């Protein structure tokens, strides 16, 4: 064992010594972050997760220690003993320890390091693949260490908050029964049950509901979940969520608990007071104004739905608008304030941008002093009455730019939603991380329970089939499922959905009606969810809950650009681990024991 480990104990971290410690003898452990040899003295910056401390090895004080220090190189892992002294006029204001240095009297090299494949510095230009390949080195960099320490703090605060609130931290199984539909599952073959598979849980949904039926009326868990889906910057195949369920609650009770957690996290982590209650917006309003159910409210520029207006004016001389409203399409406009000075080139770039999302083009009009439209093909045919009505609906002013989309609602919503954010970034309307107005929380409520699947010709649950419909909409379950809204809610922050949940169905008869509306027979429902249906008949309480995405929450709290920056050991966008080589091949004997055979043929 190293001498420093058995004979000495670390007294301080490398980030905590100040001028108040001058004169103390200290023992520090860490890595050589920087090294400078001035002949009679060797200087190093010693680093651990708390920060940096300058250490000086002087030849005329301890020649043997100075000689050993001459062997030090970057990333050597060492222990140092010495006295804290003032740096006098050589203060480094960038460091918390910048007023002092440690004059070493002893040194032990715990381990040497080969030259690192990249610099261990805050800002590096090394490609992400190389950093992920050597993730254990990447994690030595201060920005990532700060992020993971923030994540640990969020874990700690979350556990304390729920425990203090009377919640029980309970576990749920990772290996569960596979049920078709929903997210694609990772499958685990069962050696003891040949030909059968477990699925890795994509969420604890059913088990946390069963906890409520078992009488554990306040549950939480910080839980790992798994989804085999295509990856993006804000997705990982394994992810962590803060999972919560409560009995004897309605929607507002869930909001109150979760707002309390969020306010605590922002206060304790960032020192920022978030006002309560959070804004609430019906799903229908969110789609109409912003084109999606997770709007970024840090800036304005809402959409205006003009469908009824255009219909009232019988198309108003614009054939494409008329065609859209005659069918099932919609017409939307967005006012871009004081932007009539956009050049033709800039407008053309916007048009190329929307075409990349499936739009046929980008109709536009610049508003003149008298409300007339200029530099717009629409101006040639639109009736004055419709033009004036659109100006009034959009609250258009001279110098504004109006942008239009018309056609299939799903395309129009998506195009206009993305265009709004694209323009806001370009125009500098989005507050920077950490600035005033940087946090806009929103509950999006009352969405449809079902969405129509044109391919199968069936109604499907928009989220999951265990959400309680509005009582006033139960009459439509059989006759018109598209009219059924539900007690589902999403917590949105700055254009990201950071959590979602619902009040659950606890009435077995209504649950059966929901399954039938989805074309699920009694036999199929019993095959997939028989255990839940039985539990619902055993005095199931009213209950509801939510799950917050821990990874995304920390990403937003820290201002990270990607989930891979807040997960210690992330996968790439292809789902691979470049450090360990996962996923990898499996021994043929093990596959035989699992009764599994690969049919994959490399191209």
Swiss-Prot record:
Keywords: Aminoacyl-tRNA synthetase, ATP-binding, Cytoplasm, Ligase, Nucleotide-binding, Protein biosynthesis. Residues 205-208 are annotated as: Aspartate. It is an enzyme of class 6 (ligase). It comes from the Bacteria. It catalyses: tRNA(Asx) + L-aspartate + ATP = L-aspartyl-tRNA(Asx) + AMP + diphosphate. L-aspartate binds at residues 227, 463, 504. It is found in: Cytoplasm. Its EC number is 6.1.1.23. GO terms for cellular component: cytoplasm. ATP binds at residues 227-229, 236, 497, 549-552. GO terms for biological process: aspartyl-tRNA aminoacylation. Coiled coil: none annotated. GO terms for molecular function: aspartate-tRNA ligase activity; aspartate-tRNA(Asn) ligase activity; ATP binding; nucleic acid binding. The record marks 38, 89 as: Important for tRNA non-discrimination. Homodimer. Aspartyl-tRNA synthetase with relaxed tRNA specificity since it is able to aspartylate not only its cognate tRNA(Asp) but also tRNA(Asn). Reaction proceeds in two steps: L-aspartate is first activated by ATP to form Asp-AMP and then transferred to the acceptor end of tRNA(Asp/Asn). Belongs to the class-II aminoacyl-tRNA synthetase family. Type 1 subfamily. This is Aspartate--tRNA(Asp/Asn) ligase. It comes from Anaeromyxobacter sp. (strain K). The lineage of its organism: Bacteria, Pseudomonadati, Myxococcota, Myxococcia, Myxococcales.
């Amino acid at each position: 064992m190293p001498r420093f480990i058995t004979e000495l104990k670390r007294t301080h971290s490398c980030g905590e010594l100040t001028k108040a410690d001058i004169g103390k003898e200290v023992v520090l452990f860490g890595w050589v972050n920087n090294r400078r040899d001035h002949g009679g003295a060797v200087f190093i910056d010693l680093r651990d997760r708390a920060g940096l401390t300058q250490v000086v090895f002087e030849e005329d004080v301890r020649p043997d220690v100075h000689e050993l220090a001459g062997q030090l190189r970057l990333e050597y892992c060492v222990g140092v003993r010495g006295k804290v002294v003032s740096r006098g006029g050589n203060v480094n204001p960038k460091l918390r320890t910048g007023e002092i240095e440690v004059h070493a009297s002893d040194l032990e090299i715990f381990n040497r390091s080969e030259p690192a494949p990249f610099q261990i510095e805050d800002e590096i230009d090394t490609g992400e693949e190389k950093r992920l390949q050597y993730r254990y080195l990447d994690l030595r960099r201060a920005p990532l260490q700060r992020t993971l320490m923030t994540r640990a703090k969020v874990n700690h605060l979350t556990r304390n908050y729920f425990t203090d609130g009377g919640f029980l931290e309970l576990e749920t199984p990772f290996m569960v029964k596979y049920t078709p539909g929903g997210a694609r599952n990772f499958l685990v073959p069962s050696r003891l049950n040949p030909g059968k598979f477990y699925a890795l849980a994509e969420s604890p949904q059913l088990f946390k509901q069963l906890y409520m039926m078992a009488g554990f009326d306040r549950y939480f868990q910080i839980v790992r979940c798994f989804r085999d889906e295509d990856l993006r910057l804000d997705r990982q195949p394994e992810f962590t969520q803060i999972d919560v369920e409560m009995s004897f609650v309605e929607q507002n009770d869930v909001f109150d608990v979760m707002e309390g957690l969020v306010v605590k996290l922002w206060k304790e982590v960032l020192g920022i007071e978030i006002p309560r209650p959070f804004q609430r917006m019906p799903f229908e309003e969110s789609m109409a104004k912003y084109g999606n159910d997770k709007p970024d409210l840090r800036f304005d520029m809402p959409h205006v739905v003009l469908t009824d207006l255009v219909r009232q004016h019988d198309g108003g001389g614009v054939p494409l608008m008329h065609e859209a409203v005659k069918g099932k399409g919609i017409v939307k406009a967005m006012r871009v304030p004081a932007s009539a000075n956009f050049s033709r080139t800039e407008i053309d770039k916007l048009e190329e941008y929307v075409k990349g999302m499936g739009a046929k083009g980008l109709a536009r009009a610049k508003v003149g002093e008298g409300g007339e439209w200029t530099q717009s093909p629409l101006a040639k045919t639109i009736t004055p009455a419709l033009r004036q009505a659109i100006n009034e609906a959009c609250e258009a002013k001279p110098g504004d730019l109006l942008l239009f989309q018309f056609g299939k609602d799903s395309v129009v919503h998506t195009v206009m939603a993305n265009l709004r954010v694209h323009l806001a970034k370009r125009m500098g309307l989005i507050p920077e991380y950490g600035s005033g107005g940087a946090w806009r929380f929103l509950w999006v409520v009352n969405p449809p329970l079902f969405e129509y699947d044109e391919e199968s010709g069936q109604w499907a649950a928009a989220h999951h089939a265990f959400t309680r419909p509005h009582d006033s909409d139960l009459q439509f379950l059989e006759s018109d499922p598209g009219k059924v809204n539900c007690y589902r809610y999403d917590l949105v922050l700055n254009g990201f959905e950071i959590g979602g949940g619902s009040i659950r169905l606890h009435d077995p008869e209504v649950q059966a009606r929901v399954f039938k509306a989805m074309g699920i027979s009694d036999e199929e429902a019993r095959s997939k969810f028989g255990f839940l249906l039985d539990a619902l008949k055993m005095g199931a309480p009213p209950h509801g809950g939510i799950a917050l995405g821990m990874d995304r929450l920390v990403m937003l709290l820290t201002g990270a650009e990607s989930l891979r920056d807040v997960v210690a050991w992330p996968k790439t966008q292809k789902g691979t681990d470049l450090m360990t080589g996962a996923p990898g091949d499996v021994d043929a004997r093990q596959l035989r024991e699992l009764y599994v055979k690969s049919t994959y043929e490399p191209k």
